[in-house]
Amino acid sequence: MQRYPMTPQGHAALEAELKQLKSVDRPRITAAIAEAREHGDLKENAEYHAAREQQGFCEARIRDIEAKLSGAQVIDPATLPREGRVVFGVTVVIENLDTEEQKRYQIVGDDEADFKNNKISVNSPIARGLIGKSEGDEARIETPSGLVEFEIIEVIYQ
């Protein structure tokens, strides 16, 4: 079984989405299909076909979330030993050595990644280049814009 690392917040968000899909979206789509069936000929019934397509997307997402939750490896960074090392779940402050610009990122699971909110996937190039390093270490990371050197300023376990 594949393991899916996620923070407690990411796990809760997936559970909430699953609940929404099962208790709100699925019944709404089922009702829409039933209503569209009442309109007669299903071959040329656009409402029916649209609702069936929506049902397929909904059921696929439910299966995807259930698989991820069954393989979830919930890691709470607040409970990790505070060794100053970059690991999954921590928030890391890094400085671009060329521009001296500092950035703050939390390393999270794939489903939690949100670059606009400074949450990067554990599988992203930046996270892969930082994992295992400690405060004060430098990391050379290949980004889409080229090779960038960062210094790890601070590792926060929260």
UniProtKB/Swiss-Prot annotation:
Keywords: DNA-binding, Transcription, Transcription regulation. One of its GO terms (biological process) is DNA-templated transcription elongation. The keyword Isomerase does not apply. It comes from the Bacteria. Belongs to the GreA/GreB family. Necessary for efficient RNA polymerase transcription elongation past template-encoded arresting sites. The arresting sites in DNA have the property of trapping a certain fraction of elongating RNA polymerases that pass through, resulting in locked ternary complexes. Cleavage of the nascent transcript by cleavage factors such as GreA or GreB allows the resumption of elongation from the new 3'terminus. GreA releases sequences of 2 to 3 nucleotides. This is Transcription elongation factor GreA. The gene is greA.
